[in-house]
Amino acid sequence: MLIIVATHPIQYQVPIWKELAKRSNIEFEVLYLTSHGVEPSYDIQFGKTIKWDIDLLEGYPSRFSEVHCPKKITNFWSAKLPKDFKSKIKSRETTHILLLGWNVRAFIEIAMLSRMKRKFFWLRAESNDLKVNKSPIKNNFKKLFLKYFFSRIDIFLTIGKANKRLYENF
């Protein structure tokens, strides 16, 4: 079974999960840390309330964490790996894990747990090599962290050249 883990339902990913459910014989489930975006909510970047024009949960197997997570994840530390997700990842039936990002603590915990349990592990993240930190301390920490984290990934699902370069640099 393939487990896909995301922070919350994202409008441009949902059609992929719906097609996967319709077209394939691959057993999968999407696990969400929060329900952010399911109901209309105010978006600071856009300066208005956003309501998506598609149903974000219908047509594919998904569920939310059974433990309390903040409605909106605001920083790396705000979402740790829920126990129910940990059990699902450890399960014998789970063979592959697709992680959609590495921006929260829970995702790093999933990577470590996946490696310990010898699960086949994929990463798709909207990161790139274009941003340069001005602080040498931050740069060195980031290099060490990414080298460690990326060494646990079996396959990187790249999004463009800058994203691919980021992974290749480690």
Model-derived features: where do they sit?
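Nucleotide-sugar donor phosphate/pyrophosphate-binding loop at the beta->alpha transition
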Residues: 120-122, 128-152
